[in-house]
Curated annotation (Swiss-Prot):
Pfam families: MatE. It comes from Arabidopsis thaliana (Mouse-ear cress). The keyword Membrane applies. Its main location: membrane. PANTHER family: MULTIDRUG RESISTANCE PROTEIN (PTHR11206). It is a multi-pass membrane protein. Keywords: Membrane, Transmembrane, Transmembrane helix, Transport. This is Protein DETOXIFICATION 9.
């Protein structure tokens, strides 16, 4: 009789626990999605800032388009990508400090980032002053190289504005203060488009005007966020102040900043290498055009899915800082599920419209036909990128930037690019082979990061996070270790 009474009680308890777990997962998915959606607007606005400049200048001449496109590529890899990667250190430090309620450290970490990013911008600026000569050494067309060099020179003020802006973006992101960034990004973009058109066409500054307008827009965005941070009551406890702590935090900042920059730059550089290699093929104009279309489409998708990655990074970092390993694990799982849904929707839509969407870039039938043929490979690439971007966000939130950097080197430079070279030049798959090499690298990278995250001991990571941000009351009790 006693056994018959206990059995339904046990079943009811188990059912209740399952329902609670399901409810928690659903709440985590809603939390990640509610942050990811506005972050997409922030990322896309920043991306369109440079993209619209290219489009506006491109209407002047084919030479102008080629020059600004080449200049943008090298500026992104040697400058903006470096700063973007370095600021990724704040996703770990600020995110975990906020979760641990060490609010004052957000301000000091962010100030440290601003100072060092501004300092690092100086040698990058000097490098850009010699961009023309560097491009000539790389056997680029002299006219295009000269225009790209002028564009990069006038882009130098944007570099310093970007240093401040990206640090502030991570500061706000760590606190889930997304809507101020949405407003500032959209305002900057709305200001930038007419300003760029006036400077390029009305005042006839050409590429110089486009670069200058980007710098003005970045600074405008940064000033807006700075004023909000200083004036808003929501930032009282985390406010940024000039402090000597910049030297105290130097070691821990660069501990995450350098591998974070490597993660970012190695991946961006791999895509640029593929674009340059396409120029060595027999029909280089066609091959480069197709690879550029694939790269632009992939970049647009990256800025879409990166919102999910940012949300994953913030939520995982906050939960680890709060000493909540189960919350961190559930946040990571929720972000991966959302990425899976997004990847299926985007890749299947692209595949089903493979004979239509290429017309958004070109009216040349030869280009349309080639892009249609390469679309299935591009769909696999987008499928992998969705997971990879979110997994990379989890890596940054946890503080595994070194692991991410090593995985990037192995995936792209030991496997991906060599496979692309083999398929392209030895087996004569041309541009398809180059892009297939990238897909091979991103697939391997995705699988490795899946394994790393799948076998993670989240309890240990929570303890590391609490120790990292200097919390004296590190949670080592049984609830943390279970």
């Amino acid at each position: 009789m006693k056994k018959s009474i206990e059995t339904p009680l046990l079943l009811n308890t188990k059912q209740s626990q399952d329902e609670d777990k399901e409810k928690i997962r659903w709440e985590k998915m809603k939390k990640v999605a509610s942050m990811a959606a506005p972050m997409v607007a922030v990322n896309m606005s920043q991306y369109l800032l440079q993209a619209t400049s290219t489009m506006i200048v491109g209407h002047r001449s084919e030479l102008a388009l080629a020059g600004i496109a080449l200049g943008s590529s090298f500026a992104n890899v040697t400058g903006f990508g470096v700063l973007f990667g370095l600021s990724g250190s704040l996703e770990t430090l600020c995110g975990q400090a906020y979760g641990a309620k060490q609010y004052h450290k957000l301000g000091s970490y962010t100030f440290t980032s601003i100072v060092f990013l501004l300092i690092i911008s100086v040698p990058i600026s000097i490098l850009w002053m010699f961009m023309n000569q560097i491009l000539l050494l790389l056997h680029q067309d002299p006219q295009i190289a000269e225009l790209a060099g002028v564009y990069c020179l006038w882009l130098v003020p944007a570099l310093f504005g970007y240093s401040v802006l990206e640090s502030l973006v991570r500061y706000f992101q760590s606190q889930s203060l997304i809507y101020p960034m949405v407003l500032s990004s959209l305002a900057a973009l709305s200001f930038h488009v007419p300003l760029c058109w006036l400077m390029v066409h009305k005042f006839d500054f050409g590429a110089k005007g486009a670069a200058a307008s980007i710098g003005i827009s970045y600074w405008l965005n940064a000033v807006f966020l700075w004023v909000y941070m200083k004036r808003s009551s929501r930032c009282v406890e985390t406010r940024i102040y000039m402090s000597k702590d910049v030297f105290v935090h130097t070691n821990i900042f660069f501990q995450f900043a350098i591998p974070s920059a490597m993660m970012c730059c190695l991946e961006w550089l791999a895509f640029e290498v593929i674009t340059l290699l396409s120029g060595l093929l027999p029909n280089s104009k066609l091959e480069t055009s197709v690879i550029s279309i694939c790269l632009t489409t992939s970049s647009l998708h990256y800025n879409l899915v990166n919102g999910i990655g940012d949300a994953a990074s913030t939520n995982v970092a906050n939960e680890l800082g709060a000493g909540n390993p189960r919350g961190a694990r559930d946040s990571a799982a929720a972000a991966i599920i959302i990425a899976a849904v997004e990847s299926v929707i985007v890749s299947s839509s692209l595949f089903l419209s493979r004979s239509v969407w290429p017309y958004a870039y070109s009216n040349v039938e030869e280009v349309i036909s080639y892009v249609t043929d390469i679309t299935p490979i591009l769909c696999i690439s987008i499928l992998m990128d969705s997971f990879l971007t979110v997994l990379s966000g989890i890596v940054r939130g946890t503080g595994w930037q070194k692991i991410g950097a090593y995985v990037n080197i192995t995936s792209y430079y030991v496997i991906g690019i060599p496979v692309g070279l083999l398929l392209c030049f030895h087996l004569h798959f041309n541009g398809k082979g180059l892009w297939a090499g990238l897909v091979t690298g991103s697939t391997l990278q995705t699988l490795i990061l899946f394994l790393v995250i799948g076998f993670t001991n989240w309890s240990k990571e929570a303890i590391k996070a609490r120790e990292r941000i200097g919390d004296e009351k590190v949670w080592r009790h049984d609830s943390l270790l279970n």
